[in-house]
Amino acid sequence: MSDTESAAARSYAEICLRSFGTGHDMDHTLRVAANADRLCSAIPGSDRLTVITAAFLHDIGRPVEHYCRGKACHAQVGAELVREYLKTRSAFSDAQREEIVNAVARHRYRGKLRPVTLTDQILFDADKLDSLGAVGLGRAFLFAGACNSRLHNTAEEALAGEAYGREGSGIHCCRGALERRCVCLSAEICSG
């Protein structure tokens, strides 16, 4: 991996995220890059330079999303910023540039785009790993406070959302089993 390119991407991210503290700051970025590096070590065929560069740059669109009050998607804004940034970097092939841009565009859990390539998936997983444990809990409180938002959804909101509301999902299977059990119990009560 090119230490020069990795250091340059880190420096650019530091500039973009300077004074931005909603839990998607440079500390988060460094943890994601470390997670990505560990994943690359364990996954044959991964392109460490491409993955680590994408990891350093993945949240550079966050300040725009924050200041627009969520009207802009940080992953999409970030992908465009990354595209412009990479035009100044000669160490990357055109294919690597596209891979990095696409990974940044596809890293958001709530985004419309899903990971497609190995680079996309490694970045996606490295980012999500940082939402686990005590650090993830602290980031959730920090983000909710900075955005003046709730930490949870009501059951109705959760079930109406895409993650829990899709047909065939675990929640629907459980709901169906529960409804069948209630019918059986009702029949027992009525007949007994």
Locate predicted features:
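An amphipathic alpha-helix signature
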Residues: S6, R10, A33, A79-R83, ...
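Amphipathic, well-packed alpha-helical segments that form the structural scaffold of globular domains
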Residues: E14, A34-D37, R83, A105
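Short alpha-helical hairpin
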Residues: M1-E14, A55
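A short, mixed-charge helix-start or loop-turn motif at secondary-structure junctions
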Residues: E14-S19, V64
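Divalent metal-dependent phosphate-bond-processing catalytic cores, especially two-metal-ion Mg2+/Mn2+ enzymes
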Residues: R18-M26, L30, A34-P44, L57, ...
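Hydrophobic, well-structured mid-protein blocks that either form specific transmembrane helices
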Residues: Y85-F124
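His-Asp-centered metal-binding catalytic motifs of divalent-metal-dependent phosphohydrolases/nucleases
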Residues: R48-G70, H74, G78, V82, ...
